[in-house]
């Protein structure tokens, strides 16, 4: 059976505003065989009860910490020397990149047949039932495609 793996990331603010809705909707509507991993930063999981999702800290990833340190001045203001520009902010979406690549590396190390890896933004909602066959039926576009749920 093909394994389906979803990955997302969030911090405390994103979780309290939108992320908890995603987690609840996954628990309610998704087949349990769909694996969901959430990487977190600036978030204390001990303050929450989160079931059905594998939580992993981004700050345990050495490359992530090194990236943040090496690029701390590239925060969209070039260390407060210019007005904020989102396209100069090297940190803004880095958590997404590291969450997705870390999960991909983890799956590749576990098995040559790791299955699918699908990113889901934390501000998404799972409003309908989702099972493995629903996803596999979308494969008509080939091995790589964008999935909007």
Give the residues covered by each predicted segment.
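N-terminal anchoring/stem segment of glycosyltransferases
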Residues: 1-84, 91, 105-113
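Short, solvent-exposed helix-helix connector turns and helix-capping sites enriched
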Residues: 85-87, 128
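GT-A fold catalytic core of metal-dependent nucleotide-sugar glycosyltransferases
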Residues: 92-148
């Amino acid at each position: 059976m093909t394994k389906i793996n979803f990955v997302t990331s969030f911090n405390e603010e994103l979780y309290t505003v939108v992320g908890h809705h995603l987690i609840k909707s996954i628990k309610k509507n998704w087949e349990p065989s769909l694996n969901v991993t959430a990487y977190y930063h600036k978030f204390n999981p001990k303050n929450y009860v989160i079931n059905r999702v594998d939580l992993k800290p981004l700050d345990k990833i050495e490359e992530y910490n090194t990236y943040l340190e090496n690029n701390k001045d590239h925060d969209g203001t070039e260390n407060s020397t210019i007005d904020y520009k989102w396209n100069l902010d090297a940190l803004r979406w880095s958590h997404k990149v590291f969450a997705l690549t870390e999960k991909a590396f983890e799956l590749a190390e576990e098995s040559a047949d790791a299955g699918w890896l699908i990113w889901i933004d934390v501000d998404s909602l799972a409003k309908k039932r989702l099972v493995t066959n629903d996803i596999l039926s979308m494969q008509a576009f080939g091995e790589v495609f964008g999935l909007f749920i």
